[in-house]
Amino acid sequence: RAAKLELRDLSAPLQVYSDPFESRVEFARVSFGKNHLSHRSGRSDAFEWPTLARVGDEAARLAGLRVGNEGNTGMSSPKRYLWSREPTKQPWRLNYHGLGGDNEPFAAQGPFAVLVNDLGEPLHRLADDDPEKLPAMDPRYSRSSLFMFALVEIFLHAIGMVNSPGHRLQQPNSENPRRLDRIIMTIPSALSLAERRILNTRAHDARDLAYRLLRMIGEAELPPVADGALDDAGLARLPTAEGGIALPQILFEWDEASATQAVYMYSQIARNFAGHAGAFFDVMRRADNTTPKSLRVATLDIGGGTTDLVVINYHYDGAGANTTIFPEQLFREGFSLAGDDVVLHVIQEHVLGPIEKAAEAAGVPSGSAMIAELFGGNRSGQGVAWEVRRQQFAVQIAQPIAIRMLARYETSEESGDRTAQTFGFTELFAEGKAPSPTIVGWVNEEVARRGGTSFDLAQVKFPVDFEHLERTVRSVLQPMLEVLSEIIWRYRTDVVLVSGRPSRLPAIHECLREALPMYNGRIVPLHHFHVGHWYPFRDFQARIDDPKTTAAVGAMVSVLAEGGIEGFNLRGDRMRHLKSTARYIGKLDGSGRIPAEDTYYADLDLDDESKNLPDSAFDFRGVMALGFRQFPNPWWPATRLYTLDYVTDQERARLNPMTPISVRLARKQRGQDRLSEDLVIEEARTSPESGLKQAKGSLALKLQTLRDSEGYWLDTGILKQS
């Protein structure tokens, strides 16, 4: 009786969305009519929606209505910024377009703003004597807290949906109220342990805030759990409010790539092989895999922000249809290179290129210089309005055109039509998704200001050459896919599952077929995989319509399969405590790798809570990025984790003449005889020539997993790098 989550568009309440939605967040006020009528009833909040942040399609629609002169009203994906806990430079404001007004107040209104402070931190998690324990008035919510805001909104929609008359009438015992018992969340496979802990805390705080906003539980009934002290299995003690309402348990047990495998395994074993795991294993196991009762499956999950590879070995106990399957994760790795990077390169080569040529044809002396000035990095004299318009160009014009081009490329293989085509500007936007005339006019004005005459962005033609698009996709992803294919082959996997929305691109299938010495039948693209009628997000032929849905459905299957599904018993307890992949820590170079000479700590085992880092130091000469990799090979791509920098500009000016500063890191103390995987500065001293002065308090080691601290290109609009 699975049902897809429905999100109601609160600024257009008759519209309900049930398809997978993007993770954009937009601050907006909600009004359901004349509030003074509910005030007269004695229930002033009868028609009040308590939150500030809209999500999904509604957030995307509201963001598209912006004209380019507003303040900060939202962002593309707060999960990218879990590490960013500093206040924003500008306060957040409410997007006023949903209600048709022109007022843009601070995003510090309503019941939700009373429960968080200016940083977005829940007040019930702060000590009573904490000076920050004040309701939000100057909303400079950290980008990390916006992930919690989004979860609160999603949880409220879920609670409202399961108790709605329309949903309950379709279920048995429709007169009984519903409650959430468990909230199952998947984790990006490559997420660092530090970010995983932040994600866990944000999810629990979101749950608590949602139930406080609904007045189902008070602050006194919330568990006194400090930030970061939650374990992966959820809270052991669930508080119960008056009336017996218990908070749902939040489960963090499965990463996205592993959950995807659960969909495949359940579909094959329970549905296609009638519960006979042994028969399925025998059919799919390679001839050179001599281990009995085992099957080795890899998942290559290509998402929007990361590409993850997970290799799991399954073995079963029992016989016939009475078996238990035991998964064991052998390998996991992730790279911050995925679908959004493909979109960015398509924008650079296929969207900005025609605009540049059209501007030169209109009389602009150098179209490339104009593009670099408009969509390059921030420069002095550009103001906030310029940055907002640039960001709106990326969201309203560049990204939709690139995605539409890629969608045409996706279907070109199935249709067999690879003929180059040319599309007009308006043809590349879906119905009702046309960009704001203000943003189009801004581009036209900038072209005219540089000498262009009779230029109109709406008249620009965009050629779509599928061969050129394929080369663009390959240039971004092929080197990474070849590296991951080497890992897949070395682990002698029997089956490779390819998931994620970008996995539908034909170039990805071609790259894998070229790099993997395997029969095509062992490479299974989950797009259009015949999964059966049990799958909630199936198409009319019972196939997986969107492969990015497999993570959510797989997590549900994984939890239910622990004794709750007939014919399919999966023991997931061995998957709950994933090990750290940080084996080598050092300084990242410009290509995202850690050279051998910049590897400061090697052969680490951060899962052993009794072992600290080696007692060795490295030189600090200026702001530097620290990351990790799990292999000794210097060419292996590394993952960014920390930024080491001066605390203030004053300290930078004072200490820079005394560099190099010798820095020694250590693991953060978690408790008696227990060490965290988090790193801290243990010691920092200036050069011998300057007297070995203590500089520990002048440096800061901050979690930062994005290269650009200012933000992702979808949030900054920076489309061209010099």
Task: Describe the role of every protein-language-model region.
Residues 1-121, 338-358, 381, 386, ...:
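Early-domain small/polar-rich strand-loop-helix modules and first-structured segments
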Residues 1-5, 15, 258-259, 264-354, ...:
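Glycine-rich phosphate-binding loop of actin/hexokinase-like ATP-binding domains
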Residues 70-74, 138-162, 192-199, 254-264, ...:
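Phosphate/oxyanion-binding active-site loops and adjacent basic polyanion-contact surfaces
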Residues 72-79, 85-297, 694, 701, ...:
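Nucleotide/phosphate-binding catalytic cleft detector across ATP-hydrolyzing
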Residues 82-87, 91-124, 135-139, 242-247, ...:
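Gly/charged contiguous loops adjacent to phosphate- or pyrophosphate-bearing nucleotide/cofactor binding elements
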Residues 147-175, 261-290, 442-493, 508-511, ...:
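Phosphate/ATP-binding catalytic cores across multiple sugar-kinase/actin-like superfamilies
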Residues 182-198, 493-512:
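Glycine-rich phosphate-binding loops at beta-strand->alpha-helix junctions
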Residues 275, 279, 289-291, 356-385, ...:
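Acidic, glycine/GT-rich loop-and beta-edge segments that sit at the periphery of enzyme/chaperone cores
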